[in-house]
């Protein structure tokens, strides 16, 4: 943002040019916005699910998301098993199926924290904050989200890895991006099956000659 609080936009000129003083019209890329919202809300649900499965000691250490994927770093001193990962994924999908509504409220920062709203450690907040709530998930957040958790449709954890002492990173996908990832995984096996089928047909054909 600019020093006076105005939002600044970075643009890439595809055709033509822009000059100082020009007026421009901005439009939202609805598809990109929707999938980004899916991943953002899913990140909130993931943190809630991790706390439900591993315990309240889980704390966010960072995150990244875009229209295709989400990444969540967190601190946890214990060992994470495959069963923990499965339970976490299942818990997120349970919250999705509950169609929990987006309840957003502007509150005094101290009052918000007293309600149990999660805040990112080390982050500086103003006197008033925006609280985003989806059922048991409640966080201080200024970003865009879906109107209810059912909009996410589906969620899957791609990977989980250690990023240092007691720090883990989860990468996950939602909805149509999940389908794309599954296709990437299945395609090599599918191509191999097609090749084997062609070889089998050739062997049978050669045997008949």
Segments the model singles out, each with a brief description of its role:
Residues 1-209:
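A glycine- and charged-residue-rich anion-binding loop/surface
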């Amino acid at each position: 943002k600019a020093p006076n609080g105005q939002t600044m936009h970075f643009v890439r000129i595809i055709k033509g040019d822009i000059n100082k003083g020009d007026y421009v019209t901005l439009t939202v890329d609805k598809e990109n916005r929707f999938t980004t919202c899916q991943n953002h809300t899913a990140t909130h649900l993931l943190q809630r699910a991790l706390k439900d499965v591993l315990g309240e000691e889980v704390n966010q250490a960072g995150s990244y998301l875009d229209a295709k994927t989400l990444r969540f770093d967190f601190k946890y001193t214990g060992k994470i098993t495959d069963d923990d990962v499965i339970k976490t994924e299942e818990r997120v999908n349970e919250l999705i199926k509950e169609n929990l509504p987006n309840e957003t409220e502007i509150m005094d920062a101290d009052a918000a924290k007293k309600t149990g709203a999660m805040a990112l450690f080390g982050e500086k907040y103003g006197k008033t904050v925006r609280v985003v709530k989806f059922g048991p998930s409640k966080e201080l957040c200024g970003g865009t989200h879906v109107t209810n958790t059912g909009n996410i449709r589906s969620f899957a954890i791609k990977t989980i890895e250690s990023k240092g002492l007691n720090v883990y990173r989860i990468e996950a996908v939602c909805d149509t991006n999940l389908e794309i990832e599954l296709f990437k995984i299945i395609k090599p096996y599918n191509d191999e099956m097609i090749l084997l089928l062609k070889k089998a047909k050739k062997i049978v054909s050669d045997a008949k000659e």
